[in-house]
Amino acid sequence: MKVWDLHCDTLSELRRAEQAGRPLSFARSGLHIDLEKLETGDYLLQCFAAFVDLGSGEDPLVTALEEIDVFKRVMAAYPDRIAPVYTAADIGRNAAAGRISAMLTVEEGGCCKGSLGVLRRLYELGVRMMTLTWNYDNDLAASNVKEKAPFVWPCPPDAEHGLTEKGLAFVAEMERLHMIVDVSHLSDKGFWDVVRHSTRPFAASHSNCRALAPHCRNLTDEMIRAMAERGCIAGLNYCTAFLDDQPDPAACRSTAALIARHAARFKQVGGAGMIALGSDFDGIGGPLEMDDCSKLPLLADALQIGRAHV
C-alpha cells in the first residue's frame, strides 16, 4: 500500500531540537516521522509543513525560512532515499528511482506578512501548498479555532469573518502559481469565500468530518460536497479531538477504526476520490493507536473491516 500524507509538523520539531542543542537525525529519531519509519510504512509522498505560530513572539517569516532550511538540509543529506517534488511528474520519477517524495508546504499564510512578493519567493523555494491561517486571524483571513479565546467544547465555527481583500489577492496569486490553497484551519466563511473566488481544486490537508466529530476544524457535509464537485481532496487527521465525539475532550481517542469511520463518511458524502491522509504527525499528542508513520497497516486493516475500501 503506497501512502500519501498531506500534513505533518516534523520540520518544526527538528528545528526546535536544533535550537535546544539536541539535534535529531532524520534517518532515525523518536518523532512520529523519520526516514526509517517512512520506508517501513511504504510511503510514496509525505508533505512537510513549515509551521508558524503567530503567537510565539518570533518573526513569522524567519520561522518559516528556518524550517524550510531544515527541509532542504534533510533532502540534501539523504538524496538516494528521499527527494523533493515540485511537479506531479517528480513523484513518478522519484518512485522509479526508489525514493520517497517530499513536498514542502506552509502552515500559516500570515508568515508572508501580506506580501505577494514573499509568497512568490516561497514558491521559488519549493513551497507547493499553504494554509491561509493557523489558529489566529491574520491579514489574509479569519481562522475557525481562536487560540487566545476562552475554551469552549466543541469549538464553535466562525461563520461571520472570512477572507480579506488581501486574502482574495493571495488566493488568485496562488492559483496563478499553481500553489495549492489549503483551507484547513480556515473559518467557515473563509471556506466559502475560497469556493466562490477560486477556480482550481484546493485541499483541506488535515481535516475530518464534522458530522462525526463536531469540532470546528472539521468539514461539514455541505463543504465536503462542494469540495468533491471541484475535484478537491481532504486529508484524514489523526488528532483525537477531530476524530471522536466524546462530551469530555480528554476522553477523545485516536484509533484506526475511528479514522476509517471518517473515511467512510467522506466516501458516502463526497466519493472515495477526495479522500487522502493528513496525519498531523509531530503536531498532535494524546494516545494514538497509530503512534508513528510505520503503523499504517493498522489503518489498511480497519478500512477493510469497515468496508470503506478507500
Residue ranges of model-derived segments:
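Acidic, glycine-rich active-site loops and adjacent beta-strand->loop/helix elements
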Residues: V52, N208-C209
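N-terminal hydrophobic targeting/anchoring segments and the immediately downstream early-domain regions
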Residues: M1-P156, T199, P214-R307
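Generic beta-strand/beta-sheet core signal
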Residues: S184, S205-S207, N237, G278
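Short, catalytically relevant binding-site loops at active-site mouths
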Residues: D188-K189, C209-A211, T240-L243
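Loop-centered beta-sheet repeat module
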Residues: C155-V195, P201-S205
